Every structure is written in C-alpha cells, then in structure tokens.
C-alpha cells in the first residue's frame, strides 16, 4: 500500500485522519467484543443449568410414563392423552442484547390443572397425573432450552464476526496505514533534505562566483554610483 501512495503532505494528513478513525473504531469494536463475551458467558451458564434440568426432567417424565403404563396400561394412558382439548400455545418475540436480536419465547397453556386436562378424575390414577405433570414440566424446559440455545448461537456468531473485524483492523488495515504514514514521512524528509542541500549548493556557488569576480563587482558598484550621481 505504501508504494501506491503519492508522498504529499495532503496525503499524509488524510492517512493520519484514517489512522485516528480506525483506532477509534478498533477500540469501540474491542469493547463490543468484550461485552458480548461477558453476555455470552452469562447465557452459557444459563444454558448449562437448562441442559441439566432438561436431562433430569426427561428422565423423570420417562420414568413416570413407564410407571403409568405399567400400572394403568397403554389404553388408559393413550385415552388420557387423547382427552386433551387445549394444546400449548407458543409465541415468539425478540429482545436486543448489545445489538444482537435474540428470540424470546413465551408459552401458555403448558401447565394445566387436573380439570383442564380433559380426562375425568374418575377412572384415572395418580400415576397418569404424575406423568402429565412431568411431561408438562419437560415441555416448558424444552421451550426455555430452545430460547437459550438460539440466543447462545446468535451471540457466538456476533462475537466471531466482531473478532474478525477487530483482527482486520489490528493486523491488516492499521499496519498498512502506519506503513504508508512512515513511507510518506520518510519521502518528505528526503525531499526536505534535498531541498536544503540544493539551496546550500546554490548559495555556495553564488558566493564562489562573487569571490572569483571581486573587480567586476567593484566596477559594477562604481558604475552604479556614477550613474546615480549623474542623475
């Protein structure tokens, strides 16, 4: 890049402005990256808790449904499930975390009371109720896990994108700009030294000519004086 820049003071000022702007942008992106990482770590902690809950709730739901089938039979369990009239409803909204839009999943009608499940209290046992409770809680955990996992992925993508931009400024653009700045400054200094050397050379030559022709200089001065007196 440095060899492609014309070494002028105008270009030097333009590059210095670009360096200042790039350094400010680099600092801003670094702060954003660090903030995103902190937010990501919070979400990661939450995700680990949710995964643990998901495993526990899944095992409990499987254990309870197996117990209900063993005690009541598949027909009774399927009949209780088929009696369900109100199915869970899920709505999605969004929230902003440091410029990253992540989903916020809201669920309703997941947890139900005994009379909301549709099957009669007579003819069913507590085993079926326990299985229903376990699966309702499992579904709520799955919904929360989907929200957290999606947010974590979006945050991670934004962190990687921000890191690439920081690295591009730090390891490519800014070094190229500093190299161009040094190149122009060096060339301008060379031009200044050459100009000083040229002026000194002209001055020395003039002084040398004056020393070689002192009589001519005296005669010229005398002629000038006579001319002035005659006027």
UniProtKB/Swiss-Prot annotation:
Gene Ontology BP terms: proton motive force-driven plasma membrane ATP synthesis
Biased composition, class Low complexity, residue ranges: 215-231
GO molecular function, one term: proton-transporting ATP synthase activity, rotational mechanism
Gene3D superfamilies with a match to the protein in the record: 1.10.287.3240
Keyword Transport among UniProt keywords: yes
Region (Disordered): 204-231
Pfam families linked: ATP-synt_D
Topology of this chain in the membrane: Peripheral membrane protein
Keyword Repeat: no
Location (main, coarse): membrane
Domain of life: Archaea
InterPro entries documented for this protein: V_ATPase_D
Subcellular location: Cell membrane
UniProt keywords, alphabetically: ATP synthesis, Cell membrane, Hydrogen ion transport, Ion transport, Membrane, Transport
Biological role stated in the UniProt entry: Component of the A-type ATP synthase that produces ATP from ADP in the presence of a proton gradient across the membrane.
UniProt cross-references to NCBIfam families, sorted A to Z: PRK00373.1-1, PRK00373.1-4, V_ATPase_subD
Family classification: Belongs to the V-ATPase D subunit family.
Quaternary structure annotation from Swiss-Prot or TrEMBL: Has multiple subunits with at least A(3), B(3), C, D, E, F, H, I and proteolipid K(x).
UniProt-recorded name of the protein: A-type ATP synthase subunit D
Lineage: Archaea, Methanobacteriati, Methanobacteriota, Stenosarchaea group, Halobacteria
